[in-house]
From Swiss-Prot:
Residue sites binding Zn(2+) per the record: 6, 9, 43-44
Localisation: Cytoplasm
Taxonomic lineage from the root: Archaea, Methanobacteriati, Methanobacteriota, Methanomada group, Methanobacteria
Family designation: Belongs to the archaeal Rpo10/eukaryotic RPB10 RNA polymerase subunit family.
Protein name per Swiss-Prot or TrEMBL: DNA-directed RNA polymerase subunit Rpo10
Role played: DNA-dependent RNA polymerase (RNAP) catalyzes the transcription of DNA into RNA using the four ribonucleoside triphosphates as substrates.
One GO cellular component, as annotated: DNA-directed RNA polymerase complex
Enzyme class: transferase
Pfam families: RNA_pol_N (PF01194)
Assembly and interaction partners: Part of the RNA polymerase complex.
Cofactor-binding details, from the entry: Binds 1 zinc ion.
Swiss-Prot/TrEMBL keywords: Cytoplasm, DNA-directed RNA polymerase, Metal-binding, Nucleotidyltransferase, Transcription, Transferase, Zinc
Record bears the keyword Metal-binding: yes
């Protein structure tokens, strides 16, 4: 289950999840992908970086 909102600040992050996963799987640096997506807050960035698919 993908994260819908940041647990700390409440910003919606689910809209960025698929793009982030695709680009990182293609070999891009996660930092550069998050910068391009416009995620500046470290709390929002960790929501995508630390997510693990368990299903």
């Amino acid at each position: 289950m993908i994260p819908v909102r940041c647990l700390s600040c409440g910003k919606p992050v689910s809209a960025y999840f698929n793009e982030y996963q695709r680009r990182v799987a293609d070999g891009e640096d996660p930092k550069d992908v998050l910068d391009d997506l416009g995620l500046k807050r470290y709390c929002c960035r960790r929501m995508l970086i630390s997510h693990v698919e368990t299903w």
